Amino acid sequence: AGLARPSAYQYYKSRQDLLHALVLDVFPRWAQRVEEAMRAEPDPADRILAYVLTNIALVAEGEHAVGNALAAVAPSEELNTQSALMHSQLLDPLVSTLQEMGSPDPAATAELINGIVHTATKLLDGERTQEAVEARVKELLEPYVREHRRTPGEQQS
């Protein structure tokens, strides 16, 4: 990002080192944006949509593409493990929200919702617009969110 290849190699010994540094830089900011968007929603059900739409926005902004491009040219088992761990950690606030809502299997439900995020990512990579992808996501998730939204006066448990 702004560095010529020779300059980047002065700082990083290999593509894997560069990618590792990129992941360590991007992931905390990504997770923070998702968590902030979720915290901004007072109702747990609305946090689900915030989780998905924020992830879609981050993908559309391009940070995910840089990591994917580097991973394609410098694949490694360590990177795959690190990436899987970070993606798993991104699910934590979603699982917590689903637990708060009383989901019978929050981990499985979170994986299903995250499947929507992954498919949305592929659609964005396939030249669909962010607006079109978000419209399809809302079409799928808003009925679930409406069904699980608290009624006025219902106490948070």
What kind of region is each of these model predictions?
Residues 66-71, 80, 84, 99-141, ...:
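Hydrophobic/aromatic-rich alpha-helical bundle segments in the mid-to-C-terminal region
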Residues 22, 26, 30, 34, ...:
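Hydrophobic recognition helices of helix-based DNA-binding modules
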Residues 13-17, 21, 39-43, 60, ...:
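Residues in soluble alpha-helical coiled-coils and helical-bundle/repeat scaffolds
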Residues 45-70, 81, 85, 150:
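Helical hydrophobic small-molecule/effector-binding pocket
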Residues 37, 53-60, 69-75, 140-144:
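Helix-loop "lid/cap" segments that line or gate small-molecule binding pockets
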Residues 21, 25, 35-61, 113:
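Hydrophobic alpha-helical connector segments
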Residues 28-31, 50, 58, 76-111, ...:
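Amphipathic alpha-helical packing segments from all-alpha helical-bundle domains
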Residues 1-17:
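Helix-turn-helix
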